[in-house]
UniProtKB/Swiss-Prot annotation:
This is Transcription termination factor Rho. Its EC number is 3.6.4.-. InterPro entries: AAA+_ATPase, ATPase_F1/V1/A1_a/bsu_nucl-bd, CSD, NA-bd_OB-fold, P-loop_NTPase, Rho-like_N, Rho_factor_ATP-bd, Rho_RNA-bd. The gene is rho. It is an enzyme of class 3 (hydrolase). Homohexamer. The homohexamer assembles into an open ring structure. Keywords: ATP-binding, Helicase, Hydrolase, Nucleotide-binding, RNA-binding, Transcription, Transcription regulation, Transcription termination. Residues 147-222 form the Rho RNA-BD domain. Pfam families: ATP-synt_ab, Rho_N, Rho_RNA_bind.
Length: 519
């Protein structure tokens, strides 16, 4: 089929299958694939048929090739709907680049100064929110000939399009979010939770948001690899087999105790059972710091649900990880939204064979949020818990697994007890036994200022023999027999005393004998 200059070709005429959206490229050598618009700009004639509108992009008659759907290959990662504004990589290289993440990480004072330097008036800046300042800075940058790059987690809305949400903003919708078109989502097989990095363009007339122009990477890898990934639900779950080493410094007794008596592996589903004021937040911080120090290959996310704002700030400054939060003054729908985005993001990374750890504080408050937002079923359990409300929190917690095909998702969640709320007790009972590792904190130990306030007798890991060596297992079994007749307070005091005298756990186990512990 020959196409003359200016001819608009319909989808039916090209023989396209229904569902291939936004593009069919025609070339005189019949060698062009989907995604090569900008490579031919100004030299040949390309005719593109999109769902939204038809347009001719270049200047010469071309031959149309009908291709089967499976043969399509994506060579250029641009948005077909923006083909006429797409720039070559050579054009982009010589222009000023600006990364949105650099702006979102700035404090308000620094961002205001930066905006004023870019030509935005001081009077306008002082009354704007942070997201609005970023929006105007970006718009000013593009008007001056610069290019913008952005990254974020994709949230696909029911209408088929999506937005890149910023983790610095805890995935809250804002005016600086990046629009991702339905054609791009279908073209690259994108899902909610995908971490996308690429070039964006400023809003056109009548548009409110910046839009994705060219996708560079998906989940920190090339776009081509997205087509080969296996869905998370189709991956094979296994028991954890690789230990997360939590031992850092000699004086960090908490993580040393966990390393011995309740080791955590990649893919662990761990529950920290904690009454109020037993040091669970400090314990979570120490776990997070140990993981970032000993396992830089692990992607760590700290998810704080219904927490106090000052605790969020403390966690952000203490832990070198991605901290996502929804404080107690937010609505329950907000708690649910960020929990689901974080889970989807973790799943996408596991599909790319990465190791992910989520520290959740707390699963009790997440279950409370679901209880408020789920439609009532008419069946109410003791404490006011709806029978359907715990399904999604269980699905969140149950997503933790070691994957046979590669990668793992570890979830370490806290469960609140002894709060005086019957609902919290019911939620804990529902989650009791669902994990494969449990740490019990004891209020009596914390009242005596004994930290870590861990009840050694009640804490442990299923299949710990997969994480420990044979020698370690034998010595720990002997140690448990020795301390079994003791009170919890005596056990913790003994462990603190003996561990402080040894450099690490290996030296502690070597020096261990019944005579030493009886002295």
């Amino acid at each position: 089929m020959k196409v003359s200059v200016g001819t608009v070709v319909g989808q039916g005429e090209l023989g396209l299958e229904e569902g291939i959206v936004g593009n069919q490229i025609v070339s005189e050598d019949s060698a062009a694939d989907v995604g090569e618009c900008d490579a031919y700009g100004g030299r040949k004639k390309l005719v593109i048929r999109s769902r939204s509108r038809r347009r001719v992009v270049t200047p010469k008659a071309l031959e149309v090739e009908k291709r089967p759907r499976r043969a399509l290959r994506f060579k250029q990662n641009f948005c077909p709907e923006d083909a006429e504004t797409s720039e070559s990589s050579a054009d982009v290289k010589g222009r000023a680049r600006l990364l949105i993440d650099d702006l979102t990480e700035m404090g308000m004072h620094a961002l205001r100064d930066f905006a004023v330097q870019r030509g935005i008036s001081q009077e306008d800046v002082v009354v704007m929110k942070k997201s609005d300042i970023i929006f105007h800075v970006l718009k000013n940058h593009t008007e001056n000939g610069g290019v913008i790059f952005a990254s974020g987690s994709l949230e696909i809305l029911p209408d088929g399009y999506g937005f890149l949400r910023s983790p610095q903003n805890s995935y809250l919708p804002g005016s600086d979010d990046i629009y991702v078109s339905p054609s791009q989502i279908r073209l690259f097989n994108l899902k909610t939770g995908d971490t996308i990095y690429g070039q964006i363009r400023s809003p056109k007339e009548g548009e409110r948001f910046f839009a994705m122009l060219r996708v560079e990477t998906v989940n920190f890898e090339e776009v081509a690899k997205v087509q080969d990934r296996v869905p998370f639900d189709s991956l094979t779950p296994l028991y954890p087999r690789e230990k997360l080493n939590l031992e850092t410094r000699t004086e960090d007794i908490s993580t040393r105790v966990m390393n011995l008596f309740c080791p955590i592996g990649k893919g662990q589903r761990a529950l920290i059972v904690a009454p109020p004021r037993t040091g669970k937040t400090i314990l979570m911080q120490k776990i997070a710091n140990a993981i970032t120090q000993n396992h830089p290959e692990v992607y760590l996310i700290v998810l704080l649900i219904d927490e106090r704002p000052e605790e969020v700030t403390d966690m952000e400054r203490t832990v070198d990880a991605e901290v996502i939060s929804s404080t107690f003054d937010e609505q329950a729908t907000r708690h649910v939204q960020i929990a689901e985005i974080v889970l989807e993001r973790a799943k996408r990374l596991v599909e790319h064979r990465k190791d992910v750890v989520i520290l959740l504080d707390s699963i009790t408050r997440l279950a409370r949020a679901y209880n408020q937002t789920m439609p009532t079923s008419g069946k109410v359990l003791s404490g006011g818990v709806d029978s359907n409300a715990l399904h999604k929190p269980k699905r969140f917690f149950g997503a933790a697994r070691n994957v046979e095909e590669g990668g793992s998702l570890t979830i370490i969640a806290t469960a609140l007890i002894e709060t005086g709320s019957r609902m919290d007790e019911v939620i804990f009972e529902e989650f009791k036994g669902t994990g494969n590792m449990e740490i019990n904190l004891d209020r009596r130990l914390s009242d005596r200022r004994l930290f870590p306030a861990v009840s050694i007798k009640k804490s442990g890991t299923r299949k710990e023999e997969l994480l420990l060596t044979e020698e370690e297992m034998q010595r720990i079994w002997v140690l448990r027999k020795v301390i079994n007749p003791m009170d919890d307070a005596e056990i913790v005091e003994l462990l603190i005393d003996k561990m402080r005298k040894t450099k690490n756990n290996e030296a502690f186990l070597r020096s261990m004998n019944t005579g030493a512990f009886s002295s």
